[in-house]
Amino acid sequence: MINTKKLLKMAKKWQQRAALKRKRISFQRSTTTTTTTTTTTSSSTAVEKGCFVVYTVDKIRFAFPLSYLNNSVFEELLKISEEEFGLRAGGPITLPFDSVFLEYLIKFIERRMDGDTEKALLMSISSARCSMQPQEQQSGYTQQLLVF
């Protein structure tokens, strides 16, 4: 039987590990061998080849494959970032959204939305940006989510 102190110590350790895992989004990469396909997930701090990193306003780090640069929704996010923070030569790219909103957008992008949904999402992002600007100085960032 495990004593109480050891059990509490183990629980605290697992909670810390779980908290670290929640902060990272890692993309699955398929590697094909001659007989089977295996999927591995990378959660290290180094960025894999063919990926780029962006940060959110709440300092959460996201790594994306370069193929996301061809997506019109992601292009709009980068334009908004450029308008908000400018182009940084040596610093990281920071998106003017929190991590919850970015995770929401990632789900839409991964689902390969149709043209109408993409247009609605772009309009939602643009309107949220326009409605945020006067309020930013007073109350911080507020965001509206488009629900389908």
From Swiss-Prot:
Its main location: membrane. GO terms for cellular component: plasma membrane. The keyword Membrane applies. InterPro entries: SAUR_fam. It is a peripheral membrane protein. It is found in: Cell membrane. Keywords: Auxin signaling pathway, Cell membrane, Developmental protein, Growth regulation, Membrane. It comes from the Eukaryota. GO terms for biological process: auxin-activated signaling pathway. Pfam families: Auxin_inducible. Belongs to the ARG7 family. May promote auxin-stimulated organ elongation, such as hypocotyls, stamen filaments and petals. This is Auxin-responsive protein SAUR65.
